Amino acid sequence: MLKRRSNALITLSRTKLFPITTVAYYHRRLLNQQRRAVSTSPKKEIKSLEDLANLDSLDGVDTELIRDLINEHTTKLNIKKELDMLKKFSQEEESGHEIPVKRFIRPLWMFILMGSSVYLLLHFSWWKLEHEERESQLKKEVEILEHQLNELIVQDKTHNTSRGKGSNESTHMKPWYRRWFW
């Protein structure tokens, strides 16, 4: 049996129905009545979640409408997030092709330092070998010159002894400035 009260239909069961069935029936009937009341009432049309936020209460609003508005807004947000993600991926892909210079600065400095160290080491060893070679050449030249000097000294001694005293007097007769140069 159905009884009408202010805005709802109440089912009264004289038969032995389960309480769950009775509540479900009552709930379904109440929802149908609310839908009819919303569609017949001259209220503002609700087109977005902002319109729902401006309402005082959600009593007269269809739950399907609320669900659809929430789903629509969620879909918009998801699409916006996906577009942002795609833009980010495209920017990363473009920047991935460009190799940043920062990536090569440290290895470049390491290469320069190691290269200059190797260069200085090799240059020092080359300079040392060249110096030793030049030193040995100069020693040979000194030995040759010493040998020539010794020979000249010996020749001069033999030559001086052969001249005797006459050559000494002639050297004294030369002017003083000639004795210094010859």
UniProtKB/Swiss-Prot annotation:
Where does this one sit in the cell?
Mitochondrion inner membrane
Span of the transit peptide along the chain = 1-45
Q: What is its main location?
A: mitochondrion
Which biological process terms from the Gene Ontology are attached to this UniProt entry?
Answer: mitochondrial proton-transporting ATP synthase complex assembly
- Record keywords: Chaperone, Coiled coil, Membrane, Mitochondrion, Mitochondrion inner membrane, Transit peptide, Transmembrane, Transmembrane helix
Q: Which residues lie on this side of the membrane: Mitochondrial matrix?
A: 46-107
Query: How is loss of this gene reflected in the phenotype of the organism?
Result: Increases frequency of mitochondrial genome loss.
Kindly give the membrane topology term recorded for this protein. Answer: Single-pass membrane protein
- The transmembrane residues are 108-127
| Coiled coil feature spans | 128-158
One GO cellular component term noted in the UniProt record for this chain: mitochondrial inner membrane
Segments in the Mitochondrial intermembrane topological domain:
128-182
Q: Does the keyword Transit peptide apply?
A: yes
Question: What does the subunit comment say?
Answer: Component of the inner membrane assembly (INA) complex, composed of INA17 and INA22. Interacts with a subset of F(1)F(0)-ATP synthase subunits of the F(1)-domain and the peripheral stalk.
Family, per the entry? Belongs to the INA17 family.
Q: What does this protein do?
A: Component of the INA complex (INAC) that promotes the biogenesis of mitochondrial F(1)F(0)-ATP synthase. INAC facilitates the assembly of the peripheral stalk and promotes the assembly of the catalytic F(1)-domain with the membrane-embedded F(0)-domain.
| The protein's name in its UniProt record | Inner membrane assembly complex subunit 17
